[in-house]
Swiss-Prot record:
The keyword Repeat belongs to this UniProt entry's keyword annotation: no
Family the entry assigns: Belongs to the universal ribosomal protein uL29 family.
Gene Ontology terms describing biological process: translation
Keywords: Ribonucleoprotein, Ribosomal protein
Protein name: Large ribosomal subunit protein uL29
GO cellular component, one term: cytosolic large ribosomal subunit
Gene3D superfamilies: 1.10.287.310
Origin species: Frankia alni (strain DSM 45986 / CECT 9034 / ACN14a)
Annotated GO MF terms: structural constituent of ribosome
Domain of life of the source: Bacteria
Amino acid sequence: MMAVATADELRSLSGDELVDKLREAKEELFNLRFQAATGQLSNNRRLRAVRRDIAKIYTVMRERELGITGDPALVAGAADDDATQSERA
């Protein structure tokens, strides 16, 4: 069961990690919906929490697509490149 993630935690993940989190959340949502349909779901709030987690992940992915925020791996790599270039000069 995936814990409720904050947007800041999601922004610190790489693109591949976000895709993995999204896949896990969608699988969990599928399982929860199946449990609800068969009457086995004991915690209805979990459905809402997982849907919100999926929305948060999509939001972070869209922010990166629009250039509002960057991929932390790419941002760290760019900072390292800038540091080495300034040392060479």
